[in-house]
Amino acid sequence: MLKFAIAVALLLFIGLELREARDGYPQSKVNYCKIYCPNTTVCQWTCKNRAGATDGDCRWSSCYCFNVAPDTVLYGDPGTKPCMA
């Protein structure tokens, strides 16, 4: 039981802190959207509504945003995974 408690505490300490994207959906502080990217249309909608970007592309089931709005603060560079605003 003690090992389980330590493991949970460690996971919480490492990075399960949640923030919110523009649409209020929780996001991880490690910059990954909590969505699966089935196609480019879904990715482009996600980029527009979460990162303020005008374009997006699915790559290896992950959504990447491009042309991010200049006033959007990102934890990475344009062309990285969305939900970083």
Swiss-Prot record:
SUPFAM superfamilies: Scorpion toxin-like (SSF57095)
Matching InterPro entries: LCN-type_CS_alpha_beta_dom, Scorpion_toxin-like_sf
Molecular function terms from GO: ion channel inhibitor activity; sodium channel regulator activity; toxin activity
Domain LCN-type CS-alpha/beta: 22-84
Signal sequence annotation: 1-21
The family this protein is said to belong to: Belongs to the long (4 C-C) scorpion toxin superfamily. Sodium channel inhibitor family. Beta subfamily.
Record comment regarding domains: Has the structural arrangement of an alpha-helix connected to antiparallel beta-sheets by disulfide bonds (CS-alpha/beta).
Name of the protein: Toxin TdNa9
Native organism: Tityus discrepans
